[in-house]
Amino acid sequence: MDFLVAVKKTVELRLSTEPSPPQRTAPLVDFTKAVGDFGIIAEYKRASPRGVVRLDLPPWAYFAELHSYASAFSVLTEPFWFLGDYRFIPIAKAFKPVLMKDFVIDRRQIEAAYGYGADAVLIIYRLVEREKAMELAEYAQRLGLTPLVEVDNAQDAREVATWGGRVVIGINARDLRTLETNLTRAFDIAKSLRGDVDYIIESGISRPEEVEKACLLYARGVLVGTSLMKNPALAKELKAAAERCLARR
């Protein structure tokens, strides 16, 4: 059983037991505008399918330390594989706009993202059928959320690029079926999209030169999780790299 099949089963279990989300009280922010021409999206991720990332860094401390360097935050809410929690969203939202990152297969999860205060929601193209992914993205837009549609190959990226609207493509350097990471492949996909659609690059970013390369490919930003969880001080270097690139772009 590959990872996506396994995780889909856990999501179905969660949906049968989770309570209704709260009424939204946080202001809704245009996530793409918040990221700007090129921004760092810092992700709070306590664990991954490969194991624990870091448990001794509470969310409020992480967000407080990084908010000066990040344009937005990404919050993992999946509890079994990533030790995430919806309640991390309002903590992040106190500092910056928020992307809710989960394995979304149902409208109820988008409603939870909205209710807890997120401004954008991740939709993994390979997790659901094409029509379902489009339906979820459209529903997110109706609620005022920005859908970040994640792909890991050029064919899917070109397909999503035809959708229009406020959809942002997330190019994942990690293949979610094998969990292998290939940043070069992600950059190659980005080259095929340049100028056609807004996109960010996810996974595998850990060095300033990788941030600069993504920026020079006209990505709207990079999403960085594990590297910043292990070393939050890296955020200052990554932001400086982004600023250097924007000055040349």
Curated annotation (Swiss-Prot):
HAMAP family: IGPS_A. Keywords: Amino-acid biosynthesis, Aromatic amino acid biosynthesis, Decarboxylase, Lyase, Tryptophan biosynthesis. One of its GO terms (molecular function) is phosphoribosylanthranilate isomerase activity. The gene is trpC. Pfam families: IGPS (PF00218). It catalyses: 1-(2-carboxyphenylamino)-1-deoxy-D-ribulose 5-phosphate + H(+) = (1S,2R)-1-C-(indol-3-yl)glycerol 3-phosphate + CO2 + H2O. PANTHER family: INDOLE-3-GLYCEROL-PHOSPHATE SYNTHASE, TRYPTOPHAN BIOSYNTHESIS PROTEIN. PROSITE patterns: IGPS (PS00614). SUPFAM superfamilies: Ribulose-phoshate binding barrel. The keyword Cytoplasm does not apply. Its EC number is 4.1.1.48. This is Indole-3-glycerol phosphate synthase. Pathway: Amino-acid biosynthesis; L-tryptophan biosynthesis; L-tryptophan from chorismate: step 4/5. GO terms for biological process: L-tryptophan biosynthetic process. Belongs to the TrpC family. The keyword Amino-acid biosynthesis applies. It is an enzyme of class 4 (lyase).
